């Protein structure tokens, strides 16, 4: 599995702001979008392009454009919605595929409850977004669903990843690519990433 910890100074700065105990909902939400945007820029650097001729202001001109059916962005409900707009800033024509997975707080196991994928999801690059890769259970369940639907090319974007989640994801789906803004120390006894960001979903939506 390709693992990329994107160490751009802007990303480091923004993740640092998100770690603050007193970060506001407004700021956390904006920062999640901004970091998602920066991760998207990195994750799409290898997209294949093709040369086409268009009518320019002064006659025909050759340009490059992304080749093929392009992209579907896959936010994992609900926290993944906080990163979705960051992807769409760069790829506004992307189809949106939504997967609902929540984590049972007692067993820490993923529980699927919703799936609505693009009709041609198997022909698209799937960019899966979720702020936290903790145990990896929710992400693995989501990738299982995508592959069952015919998805062949998948990139995962997360704000913060735990080593335990990375290891589990690599064991289950070694053929995908992972892009993260930070790889943190470990999971605590409750399955939260340390130092982490806290509950990203609650911070994005302003709930507790």
Swiss-Prot record:
Keyword Magnesium: yes
Catalytic activity, as annotated: UMP + diphosphate = 5-phospho-alpha-D-ribose 1-diphosphate + uracil
Keywords associated with the record: Allosteric enzyme, Glycosyltransferase, GTP-binding, Magnesium, Nucleotide-binding, Transferase
Disulfide topology: none
Ways its activity is controlled: Allosterically activated by GTP.
Gene Ontology MF annotations: GTP binding; magnesium ion binding; uracil phosphoribosyltransferase activity
Cofactor binding, per record: Binds 1 Mg(2+) ion per subunit. The magnesium is bound as Mg-PRPP.
Binding residues for uracil: 193, 198-200
Function: Catalyzes the conversion of uracil and 5-phospho-alpha-D-ribose 1-diphosphate (PRPP) to UMP and diphosphate.
UniProt record similarity statement: Belongs to the UPRTase family.
Protein name, per record: Uracil phosphoribosyltransferase
Phylogenetic placement of the source organism: Bacteria, Pseudomonadati, Pseudomonadota, Gammaproteobacteria, Pasteurellales
Gene: upp
